[in-house]
Amino acid sequence: IHQFQHNGRSFRANVKNAQLSGEAGRYVSTVAGLESHQVRPLYVRAQDPKTQKPYAPVALTKAATATGFPPVSSPECLSAPQTYSLQGDSALPTAVYTGTVFAPSVTNLICDYLPSQLQNALGLTDVYAAGLNGKGQTIVLVEAFGYPTLEKDANAFFKLAGLPLLNKSNFSIVYPEGKPASPNAGILTGWNLEMALDLQWSHTIAPGAKIVVVVAAGQDSEDFQNAIAYIADNQLGNQASNSYEEDTDIVAGPLEQTSWDEAIEVATAKGISVNFSTGDSGDEGLGTPVGAAGVPSVSPHATAVGGTSILNDVNNPGSTITTAWGDQFVVLMDYLIVLSNPPSAALTVWDPPLYAGFFGGGGGGESIFFPKPSWQASLPGKGRQTPDVSALADDITGVPIVITFDKQQYLEFGIGGTSLASPIFTGFWAIANEKAGWSLGQAAPAIAALPYGGVQDVLSTTDQTRNNVTGAITDENGVTNYSASEIFTGALYGNKGFTSAMYSIPGTAAVYGFGLDSSFTVKKGWDNATGWGTPYGLAFIDAVVANAK
């Protein structure tokens, strides 16, 4: 057993497979637990561009919520094209940029979807009108530690949203291994935010379904595998959402991969779709085709849920654009520290534009451990491919939650990650199971078998790129023009199907790029950015049920 470091974490792991000698050995399929990897939740929080910190929470007071959610957010993330002239402290360089504007810089509203707004964006209004809302189904959420105000926070959220409240008839919490020693363990480890997100948004999607929260006693992989086994043994529901990850496929060893897969396989064999988030870091710098397939989402018996962004279409008001979740950032102008005595800051137009990096995107990739299952025979490569499907995950186009800190309830805005995508998709699957009247089983092969259009394919469109930001910089050498793609030099991997929007406030100008998920790119049919696509309304529900008959 050796010590390793990965993604800034230290852990121990065995470098050789463990063997059990003696007669008992033939009764043991897997030895796990020799390593100290821990499972981590996959939520992310958007930063306020003005402060570079998470958005300030809003206290849930009677005054703030007298008419429902306080008016501090809007799903209108983009606004009409404008032209900005940039001038720093020196005469040159100067710049002129034209294109779509990131609306918060104009409106001062947080770009977020409230429950009714996201329901509408996902085509669920027609689903509910058809009498479908998950009734008769149970959604299982797999979490760690728990926290004391989970139900209270959720009901505060649902009251604001006008959704059915939780009670003993539609909600329960179980602790298969007993409650943690400290009731605040979930708060201290950050699992409270994860649990709030999963509960509040799975119920938003399928408000008629019951919800059972299965709480693991710790963060070790064995704790979660035991939780999945408990779900299978007790047939708690036809769908389970798991918004967490242990490691990437290339780091986790075969023993750990096998132990996860066996637990998931048993649940799948009992008709349960075990859905997992795929991660929030794109290909983690590993490129394609391998990428960064996550454990446990890479199990061929799991359904791997990746991420999308949902943006308003400035060319067609009332419509939305769905892209792969992949946020890139380019700085056009800001303050540059001058190494003088004393140091000073000079407002500087960047020449050329300064690529500031990748700020998050849906995970995925090809397994080097699991071969392709039969239902992925038409896909590239030799290994299990992820994701299978995607849903909203971008924290920049995120959602709010209600959470309690220091005995005060707050609304937190800008929450996302594939931690959001998994409960959204699981809510859809509960509605599909309701419509079917029987358990549809694992979602991944069912989605792979759908005729084209059954799940909404995420593709690059003209509307998506029409008003992307372009610019011209003037310096001592003359004028240099920059196309939308040239502004994102180094970030595209050949991908031209993205949306960009400019953010400009005094002292700062930048461009957001949406749909740039590291080396992953969208294309017709399955792709490593969004899988087969994203569920949308009755078209998805009806297609799944019709194809299963």
Protein language model features and the residues they cover:
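Short regulatory "switch" loops immediately downstream of catalytic or recognition motifs
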Residues: 310-313, 403-404, 434
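An often Trp-containing, charged/polar helix-loop segment at the C-terminal end
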Residues: 433-524
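Internal, charge-rich low-complexity segments
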Residues: 43-64, 312-337, 452-492
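N-linked glycosylation sites
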Residues: 167-170, 341, 346, 468, ...
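Substrate-binding/charge-relay-adjacent region of secreted/lumenal peptidase catalytic domains
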Residues: 1-307, 352-416, 422, 438-442, ...
